[in-house]
Structures are given as structure tokens and as C-alpha cells.
């Protein structure tokens, strides 16, 4: 058992991380209601001996913290910028490397939002990489990364199916998470 797995165990967290070790993969992670989600995600991925990059708002990438986040796989994102340029950049990045796993929070914020971002799905359509569904459930202290979502190309149907998957999970701050109406 490595140090990350031990830390999770000491704090009473369980982990079910059973997805195959794909050379390239997106891990869609929800609910995202606290900065602790990042720490738990890092512990989870490292406890199974893997690495994952992650998207994070650019305001976190100030010196010296920015050096740390970039060293562990952080990709700064300028919030509010629309138009697909991030998706295009990530597609080029994925196409230029042999291996890359990227964790993405579709809510794009820790605040309560009904409309999730769809860039990760557009990215999956363009690259053909698998989309793993990762969930952090605070009441049960359980992290689940065991489902692979097969995108159909219908962005609305795909997003509805993904949101439905997360219905049974509760974030650290439950009032900050919703998948929308039933």
C-alpha cells in the first residue's frame, strides 16, 4: 500500500478504481463542491499508481503555487473564455503525446450550476478517447472510478446520461451540487 492509499485509509475513505489503464483517457469528476475534491482526486489516482493532468482556473497559477500545479499536471484555464479554443488546444495536446489522462470537472466551478460545460464531450468526440466517470461521495467517504461512458455523438443525450449517473452522489457541500430536474 503506497502513501496515498494509506492517507485515504487513515481518514476513512474507500476507493473503487477499476477502469483499465488506457493510454489516453478523460476522467469526468463530480460532484465538485470543495477544494478538498482536488486533494482526494490526487490521492485516489496516485493510490492506484497512475497520474492524471487536470484543468484549473488560471488564477491559481501564481508564483510559486503555479510551479507546483504545473509540475503535477495542472493546465491553467482562463474562465469566461468561450469559443472552443480550449477544446482545440487539448485535442492538439492529446494527439501529440502517447499517453495522457486528464481529469475534468464538468461543472467548471465549486458553485451550484445547472448547466454543465460540454467541452469534455466535444473533446471526446474529436479524439475518440474513453470517458471514465469518477465520483466523490462525502457521506459514505467513497471514491468511485469504475464506469466508462461511451459517447454517442448526441451532446444533449450524452450530458443527460452523465448527469443521471451522478444523481446518487453527494458533494462535501450538498447545496452546491445539482444535476438538474429529474
Indicate residue ranges for each PLM-predicted region.
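Soluble catalytic domains of membrane acyltransferases
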Residues: 1, 9-168, 173, 180-182
